[in-house]
Amino acid sequence: MTVSFDFMALSERERYKLMIGTIIPRPIALVTTVDEDGRINAAPFSFFNCLSADPPILALGVENNPDMSFKDTGHNIRMTEVFTVNIVSFAIAEAMHICGSKYPRGVDELKELSLIHI
């Protein structure tokens, strides 16, 4: 049996729900970045994967804000060209989920949630 979808006929939300429901298992990454002023940002990502080992290439699906401005992670990566991908364990799953909340730019989510930056 074959099932097909006309992605252009689906809303953005419907496409998202379809993708996250069919591409499994999907590990969750807690991506940390630092802005130009040295402030840490942390955000969860389920859209990431290894594309190549040689050369090492990692894909990270960074979305923009609704007004198309960069979210903190995208902004920081563009400014510093540095980010860290942390694989989320069950022990920090709740904190990771809270990191996905909308914090004002410049707020250190790790500090807010008592997570340690190494």
Regions found by a protein language model. Give the residues of each.
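Active-site-proximal mixed secondary-structure blocks
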Residues: M1-A43, N49-I116
